Amino acid sequence: MLLPKRTKYRKQFRGRMTGDTKGGDYVAFGDYGLVALEPAWIKSNQIEACRIVMSRHFRRGGKIYIRIFPDKPVTKKPAETRMGKGKGAVEYWVSVVKPGRVMFEVSGVTEEQAREAFRLAGHKLPIQTKMVKREVYDEAQ
């Protein structure tokens, strides 16, 4: 599973997920991308589940690019613990995903293969997603 090697601070505030994504809103590396349509915290194990299901669908061919990284720690206090005594221990890591963010990209596969792989990966995620193609801009314009 993905997590940072080290961070400046062990724990973070929760923050807010308002507005659209600030960056990462276009297909940069592959031919097709999976875009988030809703805001959410995507856990590191959900990212890994998507990677596994897509790589199994492609078998040998195709390259998968993971465009999100879980860099936010989420803490949790133990069950049946009284309030107080500080913030809980880090339970898991999440990536803050806002609408319009390209989460995964694939290359070296057909459009049908990419569509099916993204459909399977979308079932592993807690948000609505859609597939987008890479936009090729003409240099003459």
UniProtKB/Swiss-Prot annotation:
Keywords attached to this entry: Ribonucleoprotein, Ribosomal protein, RNA-binding, rRNA-binding, tRNA-binding
GO CC annotation, single: cytosolic large ribosomal subunit
Pfam families: Ribosomal_L16
InterPro entries recorded: Ribosomal_uL16 (IPR047873), Ribosomal_uL16_bact-type (IPR000114), Ribosomal_uL16_CS (IPR020798), Ribosomal_uL16_dom (IPR016180), Ribosomal_uL16_sf (IPR036920)
CDD domains named in the record: Ribosomal_L16_L10e (cd01433)
Molecular function per GO: rRNA binding; structural constituent of ribosome; tRNA binding
Any one of the GO BP annotations: translation
Record text on subunit structure and interactions: Part of the 50S ribosomal subunit.
Family: Belongs to the universal ribosomal protein uL16 family.
Function: Binds 23S rRNA and is also seen to make contacts with the A and possibly P site tRNAs.
Name of protein: Large ribosomal subunit protein uL16
Organism field: Deinococcus geothermalis (strain DSM 11300 / CIP 105573 / AG-3a)
Annotated gene: rplP
